Every structure is written in structure tokens, then in C-alpha cells.
Amino acid sequence: MIRKLLCALLCLSFLTGCASLAPAGEGLTFTDDLGLEVTAPYSPEKVAVLTSSLADLWLTAGGSIQITVGETLERGFLEDALLVDAGAGKTVDLERLIAEGPELVVCSAELAGQRECAEALRAAGIPVAAFSVETFEDYLRVLKICTQILKTPEKYETCGEALRLEIEELIADARAREGTPRILFVRAGSSARYTKAKTAENHFVCVMLAALGAENIAEKAPVLLEGLSTEEVLLSDPDAILFTTMGDEAAGIAYMESLLEDPVWSSLRAGREGNVHQLPKDLFQYKPNSRWPEAYAYLTELLYGETA
């Protein structure tokens, strides 16, 4: 369906040229995370944001949102908006989105469906910016672009640079502690097939843990990225096991509980000493955005005890 609509829009764009692009001086031109040049109008009044985490970031920058996805409302970022997807943004109603004529669309560069939507939106002459926010540095970069579009530089200072200083202090405090905590970070699904360890290369929490001075056993045991090898985990015997869930949260928790009840797993140091922790979803499954310092402080306390 998207492909058919895209072909029609490409024909239309050939006939209409680039008249819909913001003239020089009336918008901010930048390169998005798909490597494409975007010209976003300054202070747009009708904006669509297609994931809840990006909606949170746009609101933090001082923007307003008229069109979004159901998860944005479920997480309490907005009370009401026109929805083009009832869930998390994986099945966007592209025809309705285009019909609404937003001045700017902000979408995920990570979701294949949204990348296709972005292509169709560009063909329709609608400015669209695709972003990938995996680390605090990504957050700062995207926040800066958003505050430039919205002409709210003070938001970048209070919700960006001020947070950087807090995080730098937390990292310095953690690095000054004695010892190197050895951890296993797991993204848990409903069964062994969907439960795997993660590293700094493929999960932002592992980037944070590394910055705080922790040693992730999966970094030296890539077999854990394919599944939780009991033999490898026993050999490494981590000080702590941290996990988040994917998909059905209750099923992920139930699977981890059943795994940790196994006598072999319960014999691990982390199990014996009560250092198995499910990380809060709002900080470690979704991106924490303006709560990055809170997320770093939470991990620091798990690794070392109370923060300074």
C-alpha cells in the first residue's frame, strides 16, 4: 500500500516541483539521521510526532503536538491529539497523516515502517525529519535541532547542557569508587528464544553501564548475544544481573523468574546476594530524555550503593 501511494506521490512531486519546501530564511535546514537534508519551518503550528519518546523530546524542547500515536497518550505526555496509529508507531495510517497536512513530521529512523512513511511524506512535499536517539549525546544533538526549529534556546540550556553537567558529575563519582562491578544485562522476552544479553553496541543501557565503570560480561562472551548460555554465565559469575523486557512485559518477567529459580542460576553470586534487578521501563526501555541524570543515578546506586 505504501509503495503504491509512494509511486503516485512521486508523479505528483514531478509535476509540482519543490514549491512546498520552506523558502530560505523561513526554516532550519539540517541533515537528519537518514542522511537526508531537511528544511523544517520555524515554530510550526501543526506537527506530527510518530513515537512516544520523540514526542516527549519535542515537548521538552517547547513544542506542541497535534498528531501522534496512541502510546504518546498512554504514557501521559498529551491528553488529546489526532492519532494516526493506536499503538507505538509501527503501523502508521499514512493516507490519513498526509491528508491532515502537517507542517512538520518527526519520525523514527530506526523503524522500517516509519522510514517508508518518511519517503512517502517527502514525495508529498511534507517536511519530515527522521531521528535515532540511542545515547545522551544523541539526545543533546536532536534536542538542539528541535530547539533551533522552535526558537527556544533556553530549553537546550536547561534540558540539555544542565543535564550534561549532572551526568558528568555522576560518572566521575562512579569512576572514583573502588572495584569494577561485573554485570550481565539482559533484554528478556517470553522464552529463551527471545531472551538475550546486550552490549554497548546494541543497547543504550550498556553504554551507560560502561561509562559508569561496570564490566559487561557479554562484551567478552558474544555467545550470550544469541542466547543465555548457562555455561558461559556460570563461568563469568557476574556480580549483578540487570534486565528489561520486550513485548509482553508480564511474560518477560515470568520467564526471568522461572530462569532464576533454576538451581544452577540461583547459585550465581548475583542471585545469592540479591543483585538481580528489573530496570524501570520508563527509564531503560524507553529513552529517558530529560530524565537521563535520573537514569544514570539509578544505575550508579545499583552498582555501587548510594550516590554521593
Q: Which residues are covered by each model-predicted region?
A:
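Extracytoplasmic ligand-binding site segments that recognize negatively charged/polar headgroups
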Residues: 113-116, 132-145, 180-204, 250
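A short, structured surface patch at a secondary-structure boundary
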Residues: 46-100, 104-111, 214-217
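Alpha-helical, coiled-coil/dimerization segments enriched in small aliphatic residues
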Residues: 72-74, 195-225
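Structured C-terminal subdomain patch of bacterial secreted/periplasmic proteins
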Residues: 138-141, 145-148, 157, 161, ...
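Short helix-initiation/N-cap motifs at beta->coil->alpha
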Residues: 33-35, 83-95, 221-230
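Bacterial Sec-exported substrate-binding components of ABC uptake systems
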Residues: 5, 10, 17-53, 154-186, ...
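Extracytoplasmic/secreted envelope proteins and their assembly/folding machinery
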Residues: 41-44, 51-59, 94, 98, ...
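Proline-aspartate-enriched helix->loop->beta-strand connector
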Residues: 94-107, 126, 229-243
